[in-house]
Amino acid sequence: MVLQGCSNNDNDDWLKYHQQLGDALNSTPVENTEPDNIPSFPETQRLVFEIEEMREGMLNIYALRGCQITSLIAARNNQLGKVAPPSQQWLYERELWQQLSSCWNTDTPEQLSEENRERLLDMTMSKTAQLPYVSWNAVFESTEWQKSFSRASTPLSSTTLADIDPALEALDYLRRMTLHQFDRQWEQDSGRLENHLKELNERPLSAEILRALLLASQRLDEASLMLEQASAECLPDWDMTGVQQLENVAHQWLKAVNRLVDSHPIAPPAAWQDYQHNWLSLTNDEAPWRIFNSALNRHQAMRSQFTVCPE
C-alpha cells in the first residue's frame, strides 16, 4: 500500500517496520492513514509591514549631496529600482541608512543650513526606525521564503536528510545580516545574499520537514497500536537510524528558523506569530515537533515492555 502524497521510499521504510512488527507479533499490520497536509501559508499582506516611502524631492536630496546619497536615491527611484525584489530593496535601504548615519556622525551637518541639517536628521531617524521592518519584509515577502512552506510538497525523504547544510547556511546568513543591520562596519554582499536565497528556493524544505514529522508521528502511533494488541513476549531489534536522522534534522531546521525570526528586534505580525506557534514551535505540545517526540517516546516506552528476540 503506497500512500498518496508521500515518497515511495519513506512509505516503504514505515511499511517494512509495520510488517516486521506484524511478523513478530503474528498479526496483521494496522491500516495506514495518510496524515493531513500542512495548512496554507499566510497571505503575504498579512506577513509584512507597510513601509512609508521617503517623499523628498531631488532638489532637497541634492542639497545633501555631501552625504553621497544622491545617486543611490536616484537609482532607487528609477523604474528598475521600484520593481526590485525584496532582497535588493533590503540592500538599498541598509546602504542608504549606512550613508545617512555615517554622514550624520561627521562634520558634514555643520556645513549645512539649519533647514537641511534638520532634513538630514529627520531622514536619518526615519530610516533608522524603518530598517528593522524593511529587514523583516525582505525575508517574509520573498518568494524564496514562502516557497519553503509550500503545501505542494512531500515529506522529506530519508535519502535527502543529510542535504540541508546549504539551506542552514542560508538561514544563518539571513540571521547574521539581520543582527548586523545597524553595524556600519559590516559589509553586505549582494551576490552572497542572492545565492543563499537561491538555495532556499531549491525546495520547500520547511514543508518537507513538517510533513515528515506528521508522517512519522502517524506511523509511530499506528505501530504503537499494534503493540497494544500484542501478546508476544519479544520483538526484533529496531534500526532507528532513519528516525534519529529525522529527529536531528528537524530540530536543527526548526531551531534555525526560530533563531532567524527571533533575530528581528520587532514584534512579528499576528499571522506569523500564529503560524510559528502552531507549526514551528519546539515547545508547543500541539505543534508537529512535540507531537513527533511524544509519539516516539510513547512507542519506545511500549517497546521497552518487550524483550529483544534472539536472531
Where is each model-derived feature located?
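Cysteine-centric signal of extracytoplasmic or virion-exposed proteins
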Residues: 67, 103, 234, 309-310
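N-terminal Sec/ER secretory leader and immediately downstream segment
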Residues: 10-159
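Alpha-helical interaction segments
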Residues: 87, 126, 135, 243, ...
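Extended amphipathic alpha-helical interaction segments
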Residues: 123-265
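Generic hydrophobic, helix-prone segments enriched in Leu/Val/Ile
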Residues: 17-21, 100, 213-225, 275, ...
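Hydrophilic extracytoplasmic domains
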Residues: 251-311
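C-terminal motif of bacterial Sec signal peptides marking the signal peptidase cleavage site
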Residues: 3-5
